[in-house]
Amino acid sequence: MQLKNPILGLCQQATFMLSAAKVDQCPDDEGFEVAFAGRSNAGKSSALNTLTHASLARTSKTPGRTQLLNFFGLDEDRRLVDLPGYGYAKVPIPLKLHWQRHLEAYLGSRESLKGLILMMDIRHPMTDFDLLMLDWAIASNMPMHILLTKADKLTYGAAKNTLLKVQTEIRKGWGDAVSIQLFSAPKRMGLEEAYTVLADWMELEDKAPAE
């Protein structure tokens, strides 16, 4: 019998908790948090919605509309965090700087943050923002897992080639501390692999079914 990933049930019951404009508005710093980051229009909201089987994260044709830290509760001790998207040209510079300042404060001070999921559009991977996040994760000893989103936009062969290319680049620059996979929200590609990472970071273990 196939084992059911223990994080699946928690993700399916995810509920919106609150939005925070700055760190002191965040929930109590305890338990387990996994944050989702990505350049604007990298498919972050769609990935979050697919992982939770709900429309929790706001999606929009205008990238960068998520301007706050959005917290979603899985249970009393575990949360997912949707971080602000970055890099959209139409967002005013002062607002970009505001986002950056509070994102850095959150990432640098949050004791309950156990890992960072970084979204990269498979057609445009390793942007300047992505490199900054990689540098921060390694310097902070923060576990990072990359989703190469929108993998359905390429043929399977092209997607695999891009995955191998990015894997090689990351190993050369950042070592083996960062894991990476293909992901597609519309095709539901890569869900089980992503769930396994979440379960590990949130200290949930697969359990054999009762006989």
Swiss-Prot record:
Gene3D superfamilies: P-loop containing nucleotide triphosphate hydrolases
CDD domains linked: YihA_EngB
Residue ranges of coiled coil: none
Cofactor(s) the record lists: Mg(2+)
Biological process terms in GO annotation: division septum assembly
One GO CC term on file: cytosol
Limits of the EngB-type G domain: 30-204
Annotated residues for binding of GTP: 38-45, 64-68, 82-85, 149-152, 182-185
Source domain of life: Bacteria
List of residues binding Mg(2+): S45, T66
Gene Ontology molecular function: GTP binding; metal ion binding
Keywords: Cell cycle, Cell division, GTP-binding, Magnesium, Metal-binding, Nucleotide-binding, Septation
Function, in words: Necessary for normal cell division and for the maintenance of normal septation.
Record-stated family: Belongs to the TRAFAC class TrmE-Era-EngA-EngB-Septin-like GTPase superfamily. EngB GTPase family.
Protein name: Probable GTP-binding protein EngB
